[in-house]
Amino acid sequence: EGDLPKVVYPVADEPMVKWVVDAVRAAGVQRIVLVIGYRAEDVQAVFAGDDDLEYVTQHEQLGTGHAVDVCRDCLADFDGDAYVLAGDGPLIRSETLRTMQEVHREHDAAATLATSTIDDPTGYGRIIRNDQGRFEAIIEHKNATDAQRAISEVYPSYALFDAKRLFDELETLAPDSVTGEVYLTEIPARLHRAGHRVEIVDAVPPEDILSINTMDQLAEVDAILRARL
């Protein structure tokens, strides 16, 4: 509600995005890049005085893949692993991020996704595994068959990539023919098909991916965060 950017909305006395950045910091991430757009100054004001953040502007909302791609120049000299996370998920835990990092490095993965198994997966991208239980694809809810919609393991936008491979794939990823947007969720499947290793960590507690789109949901997440303090 209101015209504030969603990520700036306070929950348990802190803007949503502050909870995410704090979890990332606690996980030991060296560089933090925030992609900003609508009312960017409100987001930057949250971190006024913090010198460990970089900002990149996404002038048009052309999808999650595009939001990452606008960081290409900023990270041109970066040769390492990069988390890609949403700014409106304040329940994210640093322990989850560290677990992803351990698995990613242990298996020398091109991508590592943290997933959650939930009772009502409506709206979330489903994780498709092959007969051996290995990652195959993320299927967006709207594109899923009835059988795929019955899958309860979902992708809550927790990803860790080899940054060079991520940007290489984005370079050749075409926009969706219907929406014109570029979807980050296509990248893990492309890496898998190219023979790169994609790991899955079923490590996200269901409560951590609660959506905040109504005041009731905001109150629920607020209570969970306060109970953790």
Regions from the PLM with identified roles:
Residues 10, 91, 160, 211-212:
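Short aromatic/basic micro-patch
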